[in-house]
Regions:
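An extended, acidic
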Residues: 42-158
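DPxDG-like acidic metal-binding loop motif
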Residues: 1-33
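Short, flexible helix/strand-to-coil boundary loops that buttress conserved ligand/catalytic motifs
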Residues: 27, 36, 149-152
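Short capping micro-motif at the N-terminus of alpha-helices
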Residues: 13, 26, 41-42, 127
Length: 158
């Protein structure tokens, strides 16, 4: 993945997943697309598909009135976040030490599809600064963030 970043924010980004034949792209105010098709996270359904470390997913599932399915390991963090933008995954917890190069394009792709990626304090991450790694993050539909951040706050690694 690659992104153009200015003042800590991504302005355009592309994620290529050649194994799946999928190319995700986004620009500020221009929406997100996969292979030319507009993406939207959509409202969370009755069954949430949540990815990330088990010590976050299990407590999150326990506090939901909806059924939660734990998503198996997706080896590319950027692709996992893009899957949220495409509506294939509802949300993902991101363990500490993710890097700008894993996040900058995917963050914009998710945001332009109506989702959000936030730090444990609820703020959006900044990119291309003095520090290029991040703490725990939560990604998904904005309506899921309060519950996700509650789990992060209650977990010692958060």
């Amino acid at each position: 993945s690659v992104a153009v970043v200015e003042n800590g924010r991504s302005f355009c980004g592309v994620l290529d997943c050649p194994a799946k034949g999928e190319v995700f792209a986004a620009s500020i105010g221009g929406g997100s697309r996969m292979n030319g098709i507009t993406l939207s996270v959509g409202e969370p359904s009755d069954e949430l598909k949540v990815a990330g470390p088990k010590h976050f997913v299990v407590p999150f599932a326990n506090m939901q009135s909806k059924q939660v399915e734990a998503v198996g390991h997706v080896p590319s963090l950027a692709y996992r976040i893009a899957l949220i933008a495409a509506g294939r995954i509802s949300a993902s917890f991101v363990k500490p030490n993710a890097h700008d190069w894993d996040l900058a394009a995917a963050d914009l792709i998710l945001a332009e599809a109506g989702g959000t990626l936030v730090r444990a304090d609820g703020s959006r991450p900044l990119y291309a600064g003095k520090t290029v790694s991040h703490g725990v993050l939560a990604a998904g539909h904005p309506s899921l963030m309060q519950g996700m951040l509650g789990v992060v706050a209650a977990t010692s690694i958060g």
